[in-house]
């Protein structure tokens, strides 16, 4: 996924009200911009952090700048939650997510489950249907290890249950964790921050839901899928 124009470097002053941030541009100009991530962004909102911003000239936008990348401990981390589905699609087509690239048709945002939409629905005359839910991941406390979630997510647990229902209906169901950073070689569920989600993941795994994790190469010019990493989670023997 290439950015349409080069990102603008800046220094983070603060992120607040979930949707906003203040920053200082390289020329010393103080600006306020929009943050396309309503999550906790744990570890990525430290004042003084180097950041990169996209610029938007539309007269209908209240803020010209939008936060895209934060540097954390020397690693560039993508924070825009609107990008993972596009990057995940590229990863699938590049053969980085099992054999999903062999399916004949890919559709986006299809209705399923209990008033939900699946991020990616794959179909094939021989293989049938494969439901792919994509989760954005940027949390890392231990070097080389990516974790999800970084805060409680009831919606995430619901998605796992719905994927399990698809397996029981005779289809494939995949949870794809898209890690918007390149310094991780393993992924696991963060039980300490959301034990409910962890239990939902274990139940879904036992029902046959598959889990994959793909890391990204992040730069101010592009964010691209950089290959699969290990999902460090045992499959439970019982529900």
UniProtKB/Swiss-Prot annotation:
Gene Ontology molecular function: DNA binding
Pfam families: SfsA (PF03749), SfsA_N (PF17746)
The name this protein goes by in its record: Sugar fermentation stimulation protein homolog
PANTHER family on file: SUGAR FERMENTATION STIMULATION PROTEIN A
Transmembrane segments: none
Family designation: Belongs to the SfsA family.
Tree of life domain: Bacteria
Origin species: Rhizobium meliloti (strain 1021)
């Amino acid at each position: 996924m290439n950015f349409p124009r080069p990102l603008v470097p800046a220094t983070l002053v603060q992120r607040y009200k979930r949707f906003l941030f203040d920053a200082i541009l390289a020329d010393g100009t103080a600006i306020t911009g929009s943050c396309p991530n309503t999550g906790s962004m744990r570890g990525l909102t430290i004042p003084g952090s180097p950041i990169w911003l996209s610029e938007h000239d539309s007269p209908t936008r209240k803020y010209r700048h939008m936060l895209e990348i934060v540097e954390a401990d020397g690693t560039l981390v993508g924070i825009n939650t609107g990008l993972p589905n596009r990057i995940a699609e590229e990863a699938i087509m590049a053969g980085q997510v099992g054999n999903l690239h062999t399916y004949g048709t890919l559709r986006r945002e299809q209705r399923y489950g209990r008033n939900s939409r699946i991020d990616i629905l794959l179909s094939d005359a021989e293989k049938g249907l494969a439901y792919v839910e994509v989760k954005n991941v940027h949390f890392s406390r231990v070097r080389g290890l990516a974790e999800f979630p970084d805060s409680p997510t009831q919606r995430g647990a619901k998605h796992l249950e719905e994927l399990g229902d698809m397996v029981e209906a005779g289809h494939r169901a995949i949870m794809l964790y898209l890690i918007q950073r390149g310094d991780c070689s393993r992924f696991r569920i963060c039980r300490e921050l959301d034990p409910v989600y962890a239990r939902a993941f274990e139940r879904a795994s036992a029902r046959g839901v598959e889990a994959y994790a793909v890391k990204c190469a992040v730069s101010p010019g592009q964010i691209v899928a950089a290959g699969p990493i290990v999902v460090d989670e045992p499959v439970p023997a019982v529900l």
